[in-house]
Amino acid sequence: MMKSRFCPSPTGLMHLGNARTALFNYLFAKSKDGIFLLRIEDTDVERSKETFDLGLQEDLRWLNLEWQEGPGADEGNGPYHQSKRQAIYDDYYQRLEEADQAYPCFCSEEQLRLSRKIQRSAGKPPRYAGTCRSLSAAEIEKKKAEGLQPALRFRVPDDEVVVFADLVRGEQRFQTNDIGDFIIRRANGTSPFMFCNAIDDALMGVSHVLRGEDHLTNTPRQLLILQALELPVPTYAHIALIVGPDGSPLSKRHGSRGIKELRDNGYLPLALTNYLARLGHYYASDELLSLAELAKGFNVESLSKSPVKFNAQQLDYWQKQTVNQLPNDDFWEWAGSELQSQIPTDKADLFLTTVKPNVSFPRDVAYWVNVCFGKTLNLETAQSELLRATGNRYFEEAFEAFKKFGKDLNSVVSHLKEKLNLKGKPLYQPLRIALTGAEHGPELAKLILIMDYETIQNRLQEACQ
């Protein structure tokens, strides 16, 4: 059975980049009636935190990316935290050493740094120089007796080519002579990503690895490990990374935020999944799609090879589409029961139908609740100046028109047009700003029907001051 996976490191909060990777793996699995697996890669003992681990899982559940295998689900191939799998890795280290496919390396970080510097100055790509590759058993024991703790390096075969078919990028070829022997166990005994990631994919039955293109150069190394251990090899697909509008790595200065921050600010999960699913993947439909619909239209061959640019406005577009399609009960659960309680029952339906198409976040709902039912508006300086420039007569005539015609906006506007000889923006804008504090928004005629007559009178009088 097809099985994809998402394997984050709990060293920080989930950001848009790894949320997108998780989503693509989820959609890929669902499109093939496969299994979506979650594995926590927490071998970085110093930086891994349980709070981040739980936060990552919470974010995935909030996005409705439920895993069928992993922590809290089917744990048949577990444990799914790499920190609990060291004995498994140790067994494979022993197999490699016994087959002379791995060897101890006693080089210090300073020695390695100097070696890389010399290679770069000679115009060569930095790779391990093989200093410890041919140490005899006696030399190894002597160094250990001196108290030196070795790392373990994989012995990369000379003069070979590692070839694999990437589902996104086509055939990939890597010369082993350019790779160099690499570390598969640190000197402190812990396992780096390169090794345990490959081992776990094989042992957990992962058939497809869909990950960022920054892992592309890891793949030949992991293939060499799996082939040496005669373990099954997954199919790989390396997706383009998200970058900022200027083409540089995505960061907060581009408007990127973590999933928790987006959630706390009122973004909805379906808005994020619709935006991220289209970030480097083509969908024929430009409608808001459910996760099932996104999965049905997902095709790994439709993934872009080029970096994809983050666009905060596009994310907000999908947020607005999602809010507009929320059932009423879900809308108020999202906006908050406190806001709902401020709306008179007899005006709740009209308020919702009037305001809903014009809001994207709970703070927007709060604004229009205050417009319709609050006592004061906080005008911006430019708005106050516009009202002063309009002159008191406009608002005095508007006051009288509302007294005469009630909440019939068409009659009020006709009265102003006749009395003041106005048309266009000078006719409509001062009235909208005086009553709502905004230059744009929901249909003014409907807002007026929601407002108390006293509120309308008070705001027109305030505009005269």
UniProtKB/Swiss-Prot annotation:
* Any GO molecular function: glutamate-tRNA ligase activity
**Tagged with keyword tRNA-binding:** no
Question: Gene Ontology terms, cellular component aspect?
Answer: cytosol
Listed A to Z, the keywords are: Aminoacyl-tRNA synthetase, ATP-binding, Cytoplasm, Ligase, Nucleotide-binding, Protein biosynthesis
Motif span ('KMSKS' region)?
249-253
Question: Where does the protein principally reside?
Answer: cytoplasm
Where is the motif 'HIGH' region annotated in this sequence?
8-18
What PROSITE patterns does UniProt report for this protein, alphabetically?
A: AA_TRNA_LIGASE_I
Question: Where, by residue number, does ATP bind?
Answer: 252
Say which family it is in: Belongs to the class-I aminoacyl-tRNA synthetase family. Glutamate--tRNA ligase type 1 subfamily.
Checking NCBIfam families in the record gives: gltX_bact
Q: What is the protein name for this chain? A: Glutamate--tRNA ligase 2
Species of origin reads: Coxiella burnetii (strain CbuK_Q154)
Gene that encodes the chain: gltX2
